[in-house]
C-alpha cells in the first residue's frame, strides 16, 4: 500500500526583518514524522521541512502543534537528516530520503539506522523507487542505482550510481525536483520556471528552454510535455482508479500578507 506524501511549510519572504535574518542564518535540518492509523500496520510518512532550529522550540512543541483526527497518532520517525525533501520506500522496507541542501541521498533501514548512499550532488531532493531500482535527482540530472535492496544488503561500500539523463536545465531557482513513476511506468520530472514571475522580456536573459514551467515525462530517452504553466511543483501523484495526475504548485512569491484586499 503506497502512502507517501509530501508536505512543505510555507514561510514569509520578508528577509529584511531581524527575525528573517535569523531564519536564514540558522537554516537547519528537518525531521521526518510518521503518522499511523491506530490498530493498523500501514504508516503515512509526513515530511516536514524546518528552515531554522528557531522555527520551533523543540520536537515536543512540533508534535504538540499538530492536530489530527481521532484514530490517528503522530510521532517522530527520525530527526537526524539535513533538510529532508522527498521520501520513497522500497519493497524491502528501506526508506530513501532526498535532501535539498546536504547533497546527499540517505537510506533509513528497518532498524532506523541511517546510511549515506550518494553524496556530492546538487539539490538532491527527488527520490523514487521503481521495480527494484532507486532513482534520484539533481538539478540537471537523474541517477539510478539498480537492485538497491540487494546492493545495500550485500555491501557496505558506496553503491554505484548510473546516469539516466543529464540534459535538464541547470537553473537552480526552482530547479530542485520531485520525481516519480506514473501508472504508465514512465518517469515524470518537473522543470521549474527560472524566475519568480516570468514574462517575454526575460527570454533573452534566461535563454528560455521550452521545458521551463512544466511537468515532463521521459519516454524512450526523449522528453515530452505532460503539463505546461507549472511554475514549481513540489509534489504530484495519480488517482488510483482514474490515473489522473494531481499536483501541487508553488505559486508566485509576495502574494501572502502583501496581497491587496479584494
Task: Name every feature range the model reports, one short phrase each.
Residues 1-3:
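Methionine residue identity
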Residues 6-7, 27, 33:
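Short hydrophobic targeting helices and cationic amphipathic motifs
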Residues 14, 23-30:
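Positively charged N-terminal leader segments that act as targeting/secretion signals
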